């Protein structure tokens, strides 16, 4: 039998189920943590994170399915405010992207979550800066910054982090070609006051210069200037 509920009713029902699940997981996490059952507690934190991602995606859907013409724009404005993505070109002529969170693990629905806020941010950036910059032979760098309060045992393996959506979004803007022959990848982790993900695209010839600067990158990021040097044109 076909579901005769409206899209809004379906989304609200899903929201209710996810909220109940999150409440249950929250209670289980508290109990496990108090009892020092750390391995199972950690698994529950991952379940909670996964359900939270689904709830966020569903929450973005509800305003849109109401049919109001301004809904998509209104949702994007909220994301812009609540998930402040920073991007631009540094004084060295490097592309820099900063996101105020660690990227989710693979297989947790993270690609949709990332696309939801990163793609609109990239579109805004391209509207404001329309220079045709394309790095040819380049290095794509991911720097995962963990909060000083984060348990080192929970640092993520680099090959278990959802990167593809970010790479694809960045490639459209600043890479002539993201094939392995022209674009090499480098991954590293660091400790900071607040967790975040930093992405850089730099000319291959500048890699050792970036490595020398890496330990001294400020919490606020490398300074972005209005008229950077253009490489690879």
Kindly give the residue locations of the regions a language model identified.
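An N-terminal amphipathic alpha-helical segment
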Residues: 112-141, 148-150
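Long, charge-patterned amphipathic interaction tracts in eukaryotic proteins
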Residues: 75-84
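N-terminal targeting/trafficking signals and adjacent low-complexity tails
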Residues: 1-68, 72, 90-94
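Acidic/glycine-enriched edge-of-secondary-structure segments
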Residues: 102-116
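Short amphipathic
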Residues: 84-103, 141-146
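C-terminal edge-of-domain segments
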Residues: 179-232
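Short glycine/proline-enriched loop/turn "hinge" motifs that connect secondary-structure elements
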Residues: 87-91, 130-136, 191
């Amino acid at each position: 039998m076909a579901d005769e509920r409206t899209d809004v009713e379906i989304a609200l029902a899903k929201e209710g189920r996810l909220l109940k699940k999150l409440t249950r997981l929250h209670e289980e996490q508290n109990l496990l943590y108090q009892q020092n059952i750390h391995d199972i507690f950690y698994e529950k934190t991952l379940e909670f994170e996964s359900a939270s991602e689904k709830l966020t995606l569903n929450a973005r859907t509800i305003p849109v399915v109401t049919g109001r013409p301004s809904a998509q724009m209104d949702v994007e404005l909220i994301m812009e405010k609540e998930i402040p993505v920073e991007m631009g070109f540094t004084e060295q002529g490097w592309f820099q992207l900063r996101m105020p969170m660690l990227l989710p693990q693979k297989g947790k629905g993270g690609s949709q979550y990332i696309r939801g806020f990163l793609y609109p941010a990239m579109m805004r950036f391209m509207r404001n800066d329309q220079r045709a910059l394309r790095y040819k032979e380049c290095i794509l760098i991911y720097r995962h910054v963990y909060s000083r309060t984060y348990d080192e045992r929970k640092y993520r393996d680099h090959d278990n982090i959802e990167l593809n959506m970010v790479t694809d979004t960045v490639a459209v803007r600043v890479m002539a070609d993201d094939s392995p022959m022209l674009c090499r990848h480098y991954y590293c982790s660091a400790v900071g006051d607040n967790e975040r993900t930093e992405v850089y695209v730099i000319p291959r010839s500048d890699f050792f210069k970036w490595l020398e600067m890496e330990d001294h990158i400020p919490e606020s990021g490398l300074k972005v200037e209005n008229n950077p040097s253009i490489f690879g044109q």
